[in-house]
């Protein structure tokens, strides 16, 4: 506790918030991530908690460093890794961790292939992550109860010990599908008791995915014709209901393939110089050539012509 003779008598939380740099991190989060309001609200709550704890410490009040180990649950492509990176920066700005870096791993980075291999691998990862945030994606793969010779349990035991003993210098975030994470916690109650914050990442709406696509294209100096925009909206609605849909990740992959088609279209049709606008414009056919449309633009036109006869 702070010496009573030197402790201030009041704290301006707004000034603390702006002076810590936390405001910049949260503003970046709002700018860079579309939607995810429930997630952003939880992050702001975490920032408020740490600001109040800092204020209590400065006023000489009893305070306890909160446990901030977390689970992020949601489908792929909903921003879990990006939010973990921002969380690391926020925790550093607010003095919770020393470095504020993110170490992102999966089972393969923690679990060895033979006896005596897992402990050194896990401890090396923890050493790199100390002072920051350790993000374990698809954490449930650490636990394989159907295989008695699996070494994942050894990694789990080491993680649990460090999460308890070093919780003031390391934040562990476990991420994955909600149902699998729930089964994982039921099978490993030690994790459930050490994780105080469970944050759900909702799927993006069609409109949010379209907005995300616009940001991705802007970042690469591309634009779409109005017809291409209509095609992309249709693509999003169809792709959502097909296998292996991964939210923003699927949109990024779709735009990468559209760039390939646009480049091939320009190269094949080119008979002279192309200006910057031509090189930067996505056309309807670049989007509708996707197999998501079951044959692309030509098949749709043929079907429309057949109906018109």
From Swiss-Prot:
Protein's UniProt keywords contain Cell division: no
Domain of life per record: Bacteria
Positions bound to ATP: 74-81
Subunit and partners: Forms homohexameric rings. The oligomeric transition is triggered by ribulose 1,5-biphosphate.
Annotated function: ATPase involved in the activation of red-type RuBisCo (ribulose-1,5-bisphosphate carboxylase/oxygenase), which tends to form inactive complexes with its substrate ribulose 1,5-bisphosphate (RuBP). Catalyzes the release of RuBP from inhibited RuBisCo in an ATP-dependent manner. Activation of RuBisCO involves the ATP-dependent carboxylation of the epsilon-amino group of lysine leading to a carbamate structure.
Family assignment from sequence similarity: Belongs to the CbxX/CfxQ family.
Name under which the protein is recorded: Protein CbbX
């Amino acid at each position: 506790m702070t010496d009573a003779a030197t402790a201030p008598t009041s704290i301006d939380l707004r000034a603390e918030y702006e002076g810590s740099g936390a405001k910049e991190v949260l503003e970046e989060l709002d700018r860079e991530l579309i939607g995810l309001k429930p997630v952003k609200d939880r992050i702001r709550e975490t920032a408020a908690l740490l600001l109040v704890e800092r204020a209590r410490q400065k006023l000489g009040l009893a305070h306890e460093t909160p446990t901030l180990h977390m689970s992020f649950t949601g489908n792929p492509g909903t921003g879990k890794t990006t939010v973990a990176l921002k969380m690391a920066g926020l925790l550093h700005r607010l003095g919770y961790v020393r470095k504020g870096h993110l170490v992102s791993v999966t089972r393969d980075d923690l679990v060895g292939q033979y006896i005596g291999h897992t402990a050194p691998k896990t401890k090396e990862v923890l050493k790199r992550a100390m002072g920051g945030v350790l993000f374990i994606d698809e954490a449930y793969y650490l636990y394989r109860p159907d295989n008695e010779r699996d070494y994942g349990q050894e990694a789990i035991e080491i993680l649990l010990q460090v999460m308890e003993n070093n919780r003031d210098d390391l934040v562990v975030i476990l991420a994955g599908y909600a149902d699998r994470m729930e089964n994982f916690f039921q099978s490993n109650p030690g994790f459930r008791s050490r994780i105080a914050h469970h944050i759900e990442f909702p799927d993006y709406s069609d409109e949010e995915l379209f907005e995300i696509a616009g940001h991705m294209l802007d970042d690469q100096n591309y634009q779409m014709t109005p017809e291409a925009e209509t095609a992309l909206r249709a693509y999003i609605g169809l792709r959502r209901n097909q296998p292996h849909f991964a939210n923003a990740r699927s949109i990024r992959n779709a735009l990468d393939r559209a760039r390939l088609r646009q480049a091939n279209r320009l190269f094949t049709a080119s008979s002279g110089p192309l200006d910057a606008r031509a090189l930067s414009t996505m056309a309807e056919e670049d989007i509708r050539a996707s197999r998501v449309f079951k044959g692309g633009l030509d098949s749709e036109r043929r079907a429309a012509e057949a109906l018109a006869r």
